[in-house]
């Protein structure tokens, strides 16, 4: 991934992730916890109760659409379930690492893209605290080298 895309994903972002179901149909879902671990790896917190994790178990090929201010990238790669049960999310999630094999800039010359954002309803601000610890777990421990 180019450096500016890695930098964008280092802090954690929301992305659209596509998996392949048992009938070989693409299935998309919005994943709120996506982090770049390094230029070749993106990690995801994937709900263990949903279809995406079942799909990844059967077919590890995934696509990720990254949308942000002046960013529009398509990533393709192979997913590996690194941890069946993450400790930090408020609901059951697996930690999935994706080895990025293809990066495509989907931006268009002369077009300014303003990325998606979200906010919390009144009384739900505590969810921002969950995000902080989930993103930290997805980043993993600091390198030992």
Task: State what each model feature region is.
Residues 1-145:
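Binding-site signature for planar aromatic cofactors or substrates
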